Curated annotation (Swiss-Prot):
Reactions the enzyme catalyzes: L-glutaminyl-[protein] + H2O = L-glutamyl-[protein] + NH4(+)
Gene Ontology MF annotations: protein-glutamine glutaminase activity
Biological processes per GO annotation: chemotaxis
PANTHER family on file: CHEMORECEPTOR GLUTAMINE DEAMIDASE CHED 1-RELATED, CHEMORECEPTOR GLUTAMINE DEAMIDASE CHED-RELATED
EC number from the UniProt entry: 3.5.1.44
Alphabetic keyword roster: Chemotaxis, Hydrolase
Name of the molecule in the record: Probable chemoreceptor glutamine deamidase CheD
Keyword Hydrolase assigned: yes
Role according to the record: Probably deamidates glutamine residues to glutamate on methyl-accepting chemotaxis receptors (MCPs), playing an important role in chemotaxis.
Gene3D superfamilies assigned: 3.30.1330.200
Organism: Pseudomonas fluorescens (strain SBW25)
């Protein structure tokens, strides 16, 4: 399907959550962060969050999209405001690329990317989300482009150490519709 006339494009920064009810393309750039996409195939609405960390100890503070659990809660609230339920959405997970693999090998700590991946998968399980695709882990960064008019999510993954022309051959569409 061609890009509809009047399509809006939104670029998410780390910690942002966006939800749209009209033809929209959502974009973001991920390293160790993770993006969760929600797409409602009947209503052609949905959203994306770009979280940075698995969670925080918070008490009586506003929700903050920088944290996995809170970013998902914000998406769930958008779904509810639009008269839909989480079970009606196709959900996809992206990111969690290890950005400093050599450093990680020398230190006995876990990297943020792995913690983010585990948080995303645990939240998907806890909320019984309908996961249709995921592209997480490895090294390097990913450019994500999510088209709400058809649910396609395009991923360009640039692993650490790959030549630029090799990375372009790895472009893929995370269909799963």
């Amino acid at each position: 399907m061609k890009k509809p006339v009047g399509t809006t494009e939104v670029i998410l920064a780390p910690g942002q959550v966006s939800f749209a009810t009209r033809p929209t393309r959502l974009r973001t750039l991920l390293g160790s962060c993770v993006a969760i996409t929600f797409w409602h195939p009947q209503r052609l609405i949905g959203g994306m969050c770009h979280f940075m960390l698995p969670g925080r100890l918070r008490k009586h503070q506003p929700l903050d999209g920088r944290y996995a659990d809170e970013a998902l809660e914000l998406l769930l609230r958008h779904a509810q405001v639009n008269g839909t339920h989480a079970r009606d959405y196709q959900v996809k997970l992206f990111g969690g690329g290890e950005m400093f693999p050599d450093l990680h090998r020398r230190l006995p700590t876990q990297d943020v990317a792995s913690l983010n991946i585990r948080a995303a998968l645990a939240l998907a399980e806890r909320y019984h989300l309908h996961l249709t695709a995921q592209d997480m882990g490895s090294t390097g960064y990913r450019t994500i482009m999510f088209d709400l008019w058809n649910g396609n999510v395009w991923v360009r993954h640039q692993p650490m150490g790959l030549l630029q022309e090799d990375a372009y051959q790895k472009n893929q569409c995370a269909g799963g519709r």
